[in-house]
Curated annotation (Swiss-Prot):
Location of cross-link Glycyl lysine isopeptide (Lys-Gly) (interchain with G-Cter in ATG12): K102
Record bears the keyword Membrane: yes
Cellular component terms (Gene Ontology): Atg12-Atg5-Atg16 complex; autophagosome; mitochondria-associated endoplasmic reticulum membrane contact site; phagophore; phagophore assembly site membrane
Family: Belongs to the ATG5 family.
Subunit structure: Conjugated with ATG12. The ATG5-ATG12 conjugate forms a complex with several units of ATG16. The ATG12-ATG5 conjugate also associates with ATG3.
Membrane topology, as annotated: Peripheral membrane protein
Consequence of gene disruption: Blocks autophagy. Significantly decreases the radial growth of colonies under nutrient-rich conditions. Strongly reduces conidiation and completely fails to form any perithecia.
Protein name: Autophagy-related protein 5
Gene Ontology terms describing biological process: autophagy of mitochondrion; cellular response to nitrogen starvation; piecemeal microautophagy of the nucleus
Compartment annotation: Preautophagosomal structure membrane
Record PANTHER family: AUTOPHAGY PROTEIN 5
Gene Ontology molecular functions: Atg8-family ligase activity
Mod. after translation: Conjugated to ATG12; which is essential for autophagy. Conjugation with ATG12 involves ATG7 as an E1-like activating enzyme and ATG10 as an E2-like conjugating enzyme.
Length: 254
């Protein structure tokens, strides 16, 4: 029986309230899946506002080309999320997504053979499943990536750490800036047991995570919820990674 967690994550929606400087009193109101991307709204927004649209801003921050659920974890906005759209640098979101999938495949296996030997049709279907928010179709293809013939070597993991002042980021997360920690993280410990999240955090960020058991100075959030330190990394990857294959954790300083 499949786990209910992936389906719940694919079903989650983020409500949006989007305005354009030329039409500040006429918002575009919608909701999109947590695993979707703001850039996928651009054709509808350009038509609605009758203006070129390509860049998204929250307060004074131009948002990066990340899954909308990760952006919400980073900036912790009130919902519906009030954004401004304007003309700016365009995003080639499909290529960016597939490059991340290839990178995650390489991290997991030490090579990118699983994704590289896939047909063009399957890689296109993988991206189309994200566009359509079609979890069953996505899972049929992604299961081949996650179940390589060789043992899992590393877990693709990115940890987003606030770099602005602790008082500023705690009180106004929308003003925070972040650095991304990306380190090769083995799926098992030296004793061959599954590596736990707390162990990984202590290895990579010992100053913030002096204990591998409890969140003393900081915690991590994923998909809007705190993550237990005793969760095995491989289980988290299989259950809660973003569609591009990456496990994305946001550090919240306590």
């Amino acid at each position: 029986m499949s786990s209910p967690i992936p389906q719940a994550l694919w079903s989650a929606q983020i409500p949006l309230h989007i305005t354009h400087p030329a039409s500040p009193t006429t918002p575009f109101i919608t909701s999109i899946p947590r695993f979707s991307y703001l850039a996928l709204l651009i054709p509808r927004l350009s038509t609605f506002f009758n203006s070129p649209c390509s860049s998204f801003h929250f307060e004074d921050v131009q948002l990066r080309n990340l899954a909308v659920g990760l952006l919400v974890d980073l900036y912790q906005p009130a919902l519906p999320w009030k954004l401004t759209v304007n003309d700016g640098v365009g995003w080639d979101i499909a290529d960016t997504f597939l490059n991340c999938v290839k990178e995650a495949d390489f991290v997991r296996n030490g090579n990118a053979n699983q994704i590289m030997k896939m047909s063009k049709e399957n890689t296109t279907q993988l991206w189309n499943a994200v566009i359509d928010n079609d979890h069953p179709s996505f899972n049929r293809i992604n299961s081949h990536l996650l179940n390589a013939p060789t043992a899992l070597k590393h877990v693709p993991i990115r940890i987003y750490v606030p770099t602005s002042g602790p008082d500023s980021s705690a009180t106004h997360p929308e003003h925070a800036t972040f650095k991304v920690i990306q380190s090769l993280m083995a799926a098992t410990s030296s004793d061959r047991r599954p590596k736990l999240l707390g162990q990984a955090l202590k290895e990579v960020l010992p100053g913030l995570f002096p204990s591998s058991r409890d969140p003393i100075l900081a915690k991590v959030v994923m998909h809007g919820a705190g993550v237990p330190f005793d969760a095995p990394l491989e289980d988290l990857m299989r259950e809660a990674a973003y569609p591009d294959g990456w496990l994305c954790l946001v550090v919240i300083v306590l």
